[in-house]
Amino acid sequence: VYAVSNGTGNLEVSDFALSISGGSAQLSSATPTSISKQGNVYTLGIGLSSPASGVETGTVNPVADSVFDLAGNISTTNQSNNSIQLNDRLGPSITGIVIAGNNASVDVTLAEAAYPGTANSGALTVADWVLSIPDTNSTAKLGSATPTSISKNNNVYTLGLNITGTPDGNETLVVNPAANSIYDALDN
């Protein structure tokens, strides 16, 4: 294929338009970030501003009047074999947090199975979590940013809390994964 109707010219990123539907991933640009060719196969780079969850469908179309065959026939912008499901690149996300009535623990629900490394094995530990109460005006404080204990039931992790002082109900407990500590089965 060629960029000019007389059978000359190399294809460029501007000869293609990208789109995504479904899921949460967003394109950073509808124009590919790169292009390379090997034989009849063109590899286009896709710029995403957020990771794909695996339910998105990516579509590639030639831009109008930009792709030709040797005989000068123009490629249609409406293709039928130009879509593919994107791979899951989204790590486990927290979908729910419920604190115990006595403030001794918090249940953290993850959207999928989680592991402490990229080997898809092992159990999460207290070191995989970071806790905080960012309200500096509160008399309630955390004794440690690390949970005191951990237990698991399916994808619900119960983290033990060491709260000093008396909470008045206006505090916010923040639960985050420690840096580079919680992965899904696809090593995200």
Regions found by a protein language model. Give the residues of each.
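Non-catalytic beta-sheet/beta-sandwich ligand-binding modules that flank or precede catalytic cores
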Residues: 1-188
